[in-house]
Each structure stands twice: as C-alpha cells, then as structure tokens.
C-alpha cells in the first residue's frame, strides 16, 4: 500500500471513529433525558421501570393528601379511575394542587411501587390537562370527552 492510500485510510478511519463516538454520546444524553409517561394502572401493574425517572399523572384522590407537621413531606394518591398509586414528594406543592385536580409527577418508582417525585406539576387552568392524563382518564371512563367549556369528571 502506497503512502497516499495509507494516509487516506487513516483519515477515513479517524472520521468514522469520531462520528461513532459523537453518536454514542448523543444517544447516551438522550436516554438520560427521556421521561416516559405511565398511568397509575401501568405503574400498579409493574410496567414502569424501577429506579428510572418517569412521568406519571392522573387525578389526586379525595382525602388522600397527607402532610407532615414538621417538614415539607407530603404523600398523596393519584388515580386514573382503574388503579391508584401513592406519590411522595419533599417540597412545596404548586398553588394549583388540590384534591380532585389533574397532576403530573416526575420521579422514580421505588421497590414498594411508590413514586418518589422530585417535581409535581398541576394543570395551569381549568380547561387544560396534559394529553397523556386526558387519554388515560377517558380510557378509564373517569372523564367525559372534552367538547369545549369545562371538562367533566365522572364521580
């Protein structure tokens, strides 16, 4: 092999190695930032991966919010109409958080099936609900199809 071909082969291999490393780094970064959405039914059935950051949403069950007196710890149950899961959170809840309200929590499921949230989001006005939560509630029959005006929740 003459020196020109050797040099060209070395350059092509170096470029391929660089592109391979860049793709591997990009995929690694994307995998760490993907937060898949799971319904309470899926989490209760064990479909959510333990220890991986996920999003879960539904309606906060009436009478399920338990606060501690000496810290910012709060535990509550979220339902999609079929199943309910417990979510624990350490921090100040959003102003719009209340029982019967749609929420999305970001966190990790522990070995007990409890979602340990590091972020809780409440819907920001009376007409908005995250699409995933809306679909899960419609599927379970807890929410009638939205046709303008106020959303109605089945009791």
UniProtKB/Swiss-Prot annotation:
The keyword RNA-binding is annotated on this UniProt entry: no
Topological domain spans for side Cytoplasmic: 1-8
Membrane topology (UniProt): Single-pass type II membrane protein
Keywords, in A-Z order: Cell inner membrane, Cell membrane, Cytochrome c-type biogenesis, Heme, Iron, Membrane, Metal-binding, Signal-anchor, Transmembrane, Transmembrane helix
Residues that bind heme: 124, 128
Subcellular location: Cell inner membrane
Protein name: Cytochrome c-type biogenesis protein CcmE
Gene name for this UniProt entry: ccmE
Assigned protein family: Belongs to the CcmE/CycJ family.
Function: Heme chaperone required for the biogenesis of c-type cytochromes. Transiently binds heme delivered by CcmC and transfers the heme to apo-cytochromes in a process facilitated by CcmF and CcmH.
Record lineage: Bacteria, Pseudomonadati, Pseudomonadota, Gammaproteobacteria, Pseudomonadales
Domain of life: Bacteria
Organism whose genome encodes this protein: Stutzerimonas stutzeri (strain A1501)
GO annotation, biological process: cytochrome complex assembly
GO MF: heme binding; metal ion binding
Membrane-spanning intervals of the chain: 9-29
Main location: membrane
NCBIfam families on file: PRK13165.1, PRK13254.1-1, PRK13254.1-3, PRK13254.1-5
Periplasmic side stretches: 30-155
GO cellular component, one term: plasma membrane
């Amino acid at each position: 092999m003459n020196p020109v071909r050797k040099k060209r082969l070395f350059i092509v291999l170096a470029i391929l190695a660089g592109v391979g490393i860049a793709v591997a780094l990009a995929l690694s970064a994307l995998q760490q930032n993907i937060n898949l959405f799971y319904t309470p039914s899926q989490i209760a059935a064990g479909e959510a991966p333990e220890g991986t950051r996920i999003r879960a949403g539904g309606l906060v069950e009436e009478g399920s919010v338990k606060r501690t007196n000496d810290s910012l710890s709060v535990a509550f149950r979220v339902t999609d109409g079929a199943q309910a899961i417990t979510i624990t959170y350490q921090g100040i809840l959003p102003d719009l958080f209340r029982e019967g309200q749609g929420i999305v929590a970001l966190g990790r499921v522990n070995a007990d099936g409890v979602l340990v949230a590091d972020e809780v989001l409440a819907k920001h006005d009376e007409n908005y609900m995250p699409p995933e939560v809306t679909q899960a509630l419609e599927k379970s029959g807890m929410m009638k199809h939205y046709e303008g005006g106020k959303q109605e929740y089945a009791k």
